């Protein structure tokens, strides 16, 4: 029987363009090269689950699953998924669906949350933004995920939210020079709103930033985002251990 430290985690990144997966150990070390397949169109639950199943079959074994999903999630249930372009995800229990598909315990978080868990230092207030098909955010204090507003769908101008202002479609439409002007403005806003100790930027468009960044801003390696799957399970184990300890303490009173 495996101990928690020996168990293998299938870490999945569900994106608007590609779905990627790899297997990690509990420390976040890659045990296999990551695999990817294009996100299907339309990206409804059945088609996305089929792609995930194809990816899972590329790995010989794993004991748990962690997945990052591009949308708002509550208790493992998808509430919105604007970057997958389909209302079919509303109130879809992705956790249950993956557990039934892969027959393994599963944790689901927003994709930016998974990235944030992977790369933050674990000290102070840290903000992660992802620049891919859309704009994602994760906020962590001392390495622990915090509830926060879904910034992507807040207005940044009179007519555009953050997704529409600096997302992949807009990058292609306005070009790199104008996109960088917008990103400079966005970072300035985030600095004032969050007063973060450190900002991390990842995603396919992060490499397109060409202006000088503050010393407390880091461009993260996209590949490192998978490691959030191990961190997610680590936090789950700590939370469960804390609950168990609290129950034992109350029984002794």
Feature names for model-found ranges:
Residues 2-47, 58, 144-173:
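Short glycine-rich, Thr/Ser-proximal phosphate-binding strand/loop in the N-terminal lobe
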Residues 18, 190-222:
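Glycine-rich phosphate-binding loops at beta-strand->alpha-helix junctions
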Residues 12-17, 129-134, 204:
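A short acidic Gly-Thr/Ser loop motif
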Residues 150-191, 217-241, 251-253:
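Helical "lid/coupling" subdomains associated with nucleotide-phosphate turnover
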Residues 65-71, 131-133, 197-206:
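Glycine-rich beta-strand-to-loop/alpha-helix junction loops that act as flexible
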Residues 19-23, 71, 117, 135-140:
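Short beta-strand scaffold segments in enzyme catalytic cores
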Residues 33-35, 40-57, 63-65, 72-119, ...:
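Glycine-rich phosphate-binding loop and adjoining helix at the ATP-binding site
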Residues 124-127, 133-156:
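Anionic-ligand binding region
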């Amino acid at each position: 029987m495996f101990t928690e430290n020996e168990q293998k985690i299938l870490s999945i990144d569900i994106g608007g363009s590609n779905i990627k997966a790899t297997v990690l150990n509990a420390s976040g070390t890659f045990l296999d090269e990551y695999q990817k397949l294009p996100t299907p169109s339309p990206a409804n639950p059945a088609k996305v689950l089929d792609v995930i199943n194809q990816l899972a079959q590329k790995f010989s074994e794993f004991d748990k699953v962690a997945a990052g999903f591009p949308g708002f999630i509550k208790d493992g249930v998808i509430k919105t998924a604007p970057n997958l372009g389909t209302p079919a995800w509303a109130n879809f229990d992705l956790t249950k669906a993956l557990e039934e598909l892969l027959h393994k315990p599963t944790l689901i978080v927003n994709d930016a949350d998974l990235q944030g868990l992977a790369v933050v230092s674990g000290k102070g207030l840290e903000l992660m933004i992802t620049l891919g098909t859309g704009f994602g955010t994760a906020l962590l204090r001392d390495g622990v995920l915090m509830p926060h507003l879904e910034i992507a769908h807040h207005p940044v101008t009179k007519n555009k939210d953050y997704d529409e202002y600096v997302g992949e479609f807009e990058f292609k439409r306005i070009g790199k020079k104008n996109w960088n002007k917008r990103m400079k403005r966005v970072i300035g806003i985030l600095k004032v709103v969050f007063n973060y100790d450190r900002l991390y930027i990842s995603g396919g468009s992060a490499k397109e930033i060409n202006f000088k960044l503050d010393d407390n801003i880091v461009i993260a390696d996209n590949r490192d985002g998978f490691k959030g799957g191990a961190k997610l399970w680590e936090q789950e184990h700590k939370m469960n251990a804390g609950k168990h300890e609290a129950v034992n303490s109350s029984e002794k009173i």
